[in-house]
Amino acid sequence: MRAKVLQCLGRVQAEGLIDKRMGNLSGGELQRVLLALALEPLPNVLILDEPLSGVDVEGMTALMDMLDEVRVNYDLSILMTTHNFDMLKRYANQVVLINHTVLCDGTAEDVLSGKEFAQVFHRTGEAI
């Protein structure tokens, strides 16, 4: 059993957390452990709801880099919700803006600079 857990944690570079109690994990560490659970068994599509919530800035970058690596290594599609526009610009290859219904979709740059985004968030692309 321990070998299987280490294998799962290894997918998200978190083997060193195997003996840590869940309550003692940082936000980023907890997200890695939860992601390891979500990847067993390996899905075709990984759906994440605000995975950056509660994670510090350094942890966000590390988590997104790791998600990108997992996506490539395991040929996964990742669908995630986020309000972190900086991470969207850096990592997303397709963005869908939803406010009760699909308002627009495209590249992060296109969506974040679009009129629909400005209407929903009362912001413009230049301010992001």
Regions found by a protein language model. Give the residues of each.
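Conserved ABC ATPase "signature" region
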Residues: 1-17
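Conserved catalytic motifs of ABC-family nucleotide-binding domains
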Residues: 42
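Conserved ABC ATPase signature
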Residues: 21-25, 29
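H-loop/switch region of ABC-family ATPase nucleotide-binding domains
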Residues: 82-83
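Catalytic Walker B motif of ABC-type/P-loop ATPase nucleotide-binding domains
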Residues: 46-50
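A short, surface-exposed alpha-helical micro-motif characterized by mixed small hydrophobic
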Residues: 88-90
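H-loop (His-switch) and adjacent beta-strand-loop-beta switch element
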Residues: 95-107
